[in-house]
Amino acid sequence: MTQHLHKASIALFALAAVAAQAQPAGEQAEQFTPEFRQLHTSFDAKHSPKIVAPDSVKRGEWFTVTVSVGAGSQHPSLQEHFVRYIALYKDSLEISRVYLHPVYSAPKVTFTVALDEGGALRAVAEPTHSAAWETSKKIVVRP
């Protein structure tokens, strides 16, 4: 019985430590790796995100946007080198962000979104060994 209570106490302590580190949504720390603050916008076959989405959509209707990292070849997903996250923006507004796990997650994400007006869809992907990479695609929204 004492051993069982001890294990339960350890589990509660671990949960409390995680909860204590959580920050309110408005106070989240910047997500870029501190030593890499500048976005890469030039093409790189292994690191540039590839956006697959329609060129034109109807206002307010849901559609899919698939972002994969490695426009020429897929980025690796290794313990020592992987893509931390893929984020999707409409112009400067972040729509969604998916965090990836090394080894178990391929750097490919499909988002389902709806837009009220056209603009640029921007995909940002941050690997562990460099600054984030960005690609954009114009999208037209019809009435």
What function would you assign to each model-found segment?
Residues 24-57:
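Short, compositionally biased P/S/T/A/G/V-rich stretches that sit at domain boundaries
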Residues 57-70:
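Contiguous beta-strand segments within globular domains
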Residues 62, 116-120:
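Extracellular Ig-like/FN3 beta-sandwich strand-entry sites
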Residues 68-78:
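Short amphipathic, basic-aromatic surface patches that mediate peripheral association
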Residues 78-84:
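Short coil-to-beta strand junction motifs in C2/discoidin
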Residues 107-114:
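Exposed aromatic-hydrophobic patches
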Residues 127-136:
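Short acidic/polar inter-strand loop motif in beta-rich domains
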Residues 138-143:
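Short beta-strand edge segments in extracellular beta-sheet folds
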